[in-house]
Amino acid sequence: MATFVSNWSTKSVSESFIAPLQKRAEKDVPVGNDVPIIDLQQHHHLLVQQITKACQDFGLFQVINHGFPEELMLETMEVCKEFFALPAEEKEKFKPKGEAAKFELPLEQKAKLYVEGEQLSNEEFLYWKDTLAHGCHPLDQDLVNSWPEKPAKYREVVAKYSVEVRKLTMRMLDYICEGLGLKLGYFDNELSQIQMMLTNYYPPCPDPSSTLGSGGHYDGNLITLLQQDLPGLQQLIVKDATWIAVQPIPTAFVVNLGLTLKVITNEKFEGSIHRVVTDPTRDRVSIATLIGPDYSCTIEPAKELLNQDNPPLYKPYSYSEFADIYLSDKSDYDSGVKPYKINV
């Protein structure tokens, strides 16, 4: 039976967690002082302008003064930390019986715990984390009842958080629409139907130089909002082929654009290639809310953005077919969309 990384007490790293040399993080990664930090309370025109530029240049940015209740952010982080501090037998309830949980389609909406990185069965090494994942929209009672009963406030707090984070995410998507010249609400349909919350726990690691909390990747969905309170997140600056550290800001959200949004914008906007490194002394919890299409969707560049000078860079494809490739083919960051790329 798999052991929770969060319950390990060890002075060495098991061989199964040792990353190949070419996939390991560099020793000294500089803080990315150029990562955009956008104040959502500033003048609307400037706000849209800054978000548009951040989407074009980085595919990742942080937002402050966003109106999300700060107390709710703190409460949610606290109950998530409390969950991972529970005894192993309590967390066992969220592991499928018989075999380790793996990310596969359709993603299970009910709460499931992924341990020892085993969702990456096609990788040659495991990631130093445990992940609690569950759906958050719509919030019907059956779904909420699948969430952890302990900590006692988990369901109440996370339900409130899920509603508020969706409001903020849809607001971000409308700012993106404005920057692209798309009608407001363009994404307020099946393109944003699925909402998953992935809470990642990265325990202290005896040898951070040989392990990863998460390898370099695009998110496959539309957009992700990430709450973090400690360093660990790093982004690849593609044009320079260098990694930078994304410094946490208390009560800020990191906004990651996914591969699906990159395709819909016909590459007007970038996606974010990012990874997570481990720490020798501190444990880290991050809360990621991923919003993306229903699996029945067809994905293609928005027709409103296409013309003779800007032809489509991708042919239409099934989101479920893409997701199968995305989850199974790790040969390149954008392997999931390569079969649909049009050479123009």
Curated annotation (Swiss-Prot):
Names of the cofactor(s): Fe(2+); L-ascorbate
EC numbers: 1.14.11.11
Q: A biological process (GO) annotation for this entry? A: coumarin biosynthetic process
Which tissues is this protein detected in according to the database? Root.
SUPFAM superfamilies named in the record: Clavaminate synthase-like
Q: Name one GO molecular function term.
A: L-ascorbic acid binding
Cite the annotated pathway: Alkaloid biosynthesis; scopolamine biosynthesis
Where does this protein hold Fe cation?
A: 217, 219, 274
Query: Which reaction is this enzyme known to catalyze?
Result: L-hyoscyamine + 2-oxoglutarate + O2 = (6S)-6-hydroxyhyoscyamine + succinate + CO2
Question: Which positions are annotated as binding 2-oxoglutarate?
Answer: 284
What are the Fe2OG dioxygenase domain coordinates in residue numbering?
193-293
Write the record's keywords in alphabetical order, separated by commas.
Dioxygenase, Iron, Metal-binding, Oxidoreductase, Vitamin C
* Name of the top EC class for this enzyme: oxidoreductase
Q: Which Gene3D superfamilies match?
A: B-lactam Antibiotic, Isopenicillin N Synthase, Chain
Does the UniProt entry include the keyword Aminoacyl-tRNA synthetase? no
- Post-translational modification (record): The N-terminus is blocked.
Q: Name one Pfam family in it.
A: 2OG-FeII_Oxy
Q: Can you state the subunit structure given in the record?
A: Monomer.
According to its UniProt record, which protein family does this protein belong to?
Answer: Belongs to the iron/ascorbate-dependent oxidoreductase family.
Q: State the name under which the record lists this protein.
A: Hyoscyamine 6-dioxygenase
